[in-house]
Amino acid sequence: MAKFVLAGRADCPYYAKAELLADYLQKNLPDFRIHKITQHPDIWEEWLKDLCKKNRWSHNKSPIIWRELLDRGGKGLLLGGYNEFLEHAQLYYGVTSSMTTELMKRVAQENLGTHIEKELEKESLKGLVNPLQVWITSASSLACYHLIPILTSGEVFGPQMEISINLFDNKHTEEKLISHKQEAEDLASPCLQSVSICTQAEEAFHGAHVIIILDDHVDKEINSLEDCIRSRAPLCQLYGSLIEKNAHNFAKIIVGGKTFVNLKTALLMKYAPTFAHNIIAVALGVEGQAKAALARKLKITPSCIKDVIIWGNISGNNYVDLRKAKVYRYESAIWGPPHYSRPVLSLLFDREWVNREFVVSLKTLTATGRQFGGMLAAHSIATTLKYWCHGSPPGEIVSLGVLSEGQFGIPKGIVFSMPVKFENGTWVVLTDLKNTEISQQVMTRMANDLIQEQLVALGELANFQPYQSENLI
């Protein structure tokens, strides 16, 4: 079977003439098939350039005709333009075209009008669906790769909510973004309406309902901690201005990862003040690491442990609070129904392990980022988003990085991880919890580091001087 593709500028007279000839051949020859593509004059040249680059062809006029040896989408063999197609029809089929110049021009204008009508119809149909626009920054990362299938599963936003995923990263990562896009489409998820790629900053976050900020790339070697901190400010300033300009009025912005999570959240709040209350930092990754360490010690599964609280700097100096932590389904002489729980600290008899080894191991994981890979980052972000949309489990404490308003004696104006619950599409700080007082020394240590990070990032402090004190449980 001879399968041809005819593509051209919608207002091109020669496309109109080639189209008439192709229609005649398809009608009269049983094994001749034609697929037609029109492009608006404003985008034709760029579309043709991309097509030729992809297929390694050399062609710069309208129309362009190629033959596909397989069904549409198979390997293409360039035939050429109108003249080459006419010559091919004469030699192989003994058919030519006698269309007049006047008729060519008239049909070309009709083609342009039809093309514009079809495009407007497509846009109106898209408007009827109105999917949730989800934007992911640093989208070439491993965390994004693991995040996409969770977002498209229907577990986060609900099985009835259609989403459009927008992958945003720099131009150098375009090949990896294309790979992520193709794999996402291969999932064939009923919740996924479309996947798009964005490498132009000015186009980022248009109509965004959800924005996920992942760890940014480090393109050059950074010699000092201060330089590393300062390097976050320009990107957060760019993101903040784009969010203010392009995002939906009630967009949810969630910051995840393993480096300067609180700092990036605070900077985004500064540069996108309209959305400050809707910007949060994910702490569930660190919370999960703490639960896993406890579970290994108690020889149970991590999901049996609830209400571990992470205070302070999610990716820096923090305080893992076990005073409210509970264990469910623990095998011992005492058993109860599924809702029966026991305090974690009552089952950990090795206080030396709790106060030393447990603390040091978690501090090392936080400081180095080890074992905080793409899978953990993706799961903690997705779970936090699910809670934000549908509420956290009743009675369960969730750790979250939010802007302090002075709760628990925390200094105002810093992003601090603290206990919250999610309900009715928002989060509420659990200020009524009892026995959650934090010693002045621990509070000073955590707050001091967060304040210094912000001052260094904004250029108001030259050197970062971490608070010298041991981490205590």
From Swiss-Prot:
Cell inner membrane found in the keyword field: no
Keywords from the named record: NAD, Oxidoreductase, Tricarboxylic acid cycle
Pfam families reported for this sequence: Ldh_1_C
GO biological process: malate metabolic process; NADH metabolic process; oxaloacetate metabolic process; tricarboxylic acid cycle
Highest taxon, organism lineage: Eukaryota
InterPro entries named in the record: Lactate/malate_DH_C, Lactate_DH/Glyco_Ohase_4_C, Malate_DH_type2, NAD(P)-bd_dom_sf
Enzyme Commission code(s) on record: 1.1.1.-
First-tier enzyme category under EC: oxidoreductase
One term of GO molecular function: L-malate dehydrogenase (NAD+) activity
Family affiliation: Belongs to the LDH/MDH superfamily. MDH type 2 family.
Entries under PANTHER family matching the protein: MALATE DEHYDROGENASE
UniProt protein name: Putative malate dehydrogenase 1B
